Amino acid sequence: MAKQKFKITNWPTYNKALINRGSITFWLDDEAIQAWYESATPSSRGRPQRYSDLAITTVLVIKRVFRLTLRAAQGFIDSIFSLMNVPLRCPDYSCVSRRAKSVNVSFKTPTRGEIAHLVIDSTGLKVFGEGEWKVKKHGQERRRIWRKLHLAVDSNTHEIICADLSLNNVTDSEAFPGLIRQTHRKIRAAAADGAYDTRLCHDELRRKKISALIPPRKGAGYWPGEYADRNRAVANQRMTGSNARWKWTTDYNRRSIAETAMYRVKQLFGGSLTLRDYDGQVAEAMALVRALNKMTKAGMPESVRIA
């Protein structure tokens, strides 16, 4: 079968969005500059914070986008302020490292309304370990540490609606309830792979009145109770011998957009985390998600099939 060909119909707009990704003013905007220093009165005793949460978030975002260390990010942002003749200073790298453990990095977009298809998947981000070339040539060492990034993506807009970072030993199904509870928007259907075919995931989707598009595992049995979505998928599997027809009739293949999101994460920001503390790694991962959503909002390709 010949490979399908597509043509981008909004190339001028998308091309400009790609160029803007390299603009420092795209990431260090007026909103961040105006709210750089903390203005709120502290609610507890102790030394007040000098820099706002938005300032710390902005530093973490720039660090991920341009793949800098914290020290390099400090020097980079200070030089930008100097060139712009703006009387601001970047937080010290040690301050950013400390504040990253407690900062709440907001990645949600102002988009509202119903979500037709929410697609869910996870990927690994390396914290410690050798590169793939060394593993291929000499084998892996015992100490390899990873974190799992869980994402829920709107298949129509490509925006990341929910995101979470967990330890490597947390399964996808265990992380699912906390992930899906991050949004209160109405969702028609949620699609995920067979790793989410557990009662825990189906119960959470039923509680939120979301149609479950999760393929049952091979040889799966019926579940008693109110699991109509899954039992229909099991019945289809038994009649046809596979999940292929069920996937086609339910539009399950839109779930590939979640894999596209994972690919964008790795290609744009790399596949590793650099902060040492786990809470800091959570902030670093959420800054990555915030940056990806900002890129998505700036412009995405719109394509039509031509062959």
Place the predicted regions along the sequence by residue.
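Residue-level detector of alpha-helical secondary structure
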Residues: 13, 17, 58-61, 79
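Basic, low-complexity segments
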Residues: 1-45
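Polybasic low-complexity intrinsically disordered regions
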Residues: 41-57, 65-71, 75, 79, ...
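Sequence-level motif detector for i,i+2 pairs with an aromatic at +2
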Residues: 3, 23, 113-115, 253
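Short arginine-rich
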Residues: 84-87, 294
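Basic, amphipathic alpha-helical segments enriched in Lys/Arg and hydrophobic/aromatic residues
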Residues: 2, 53-65, 243-307
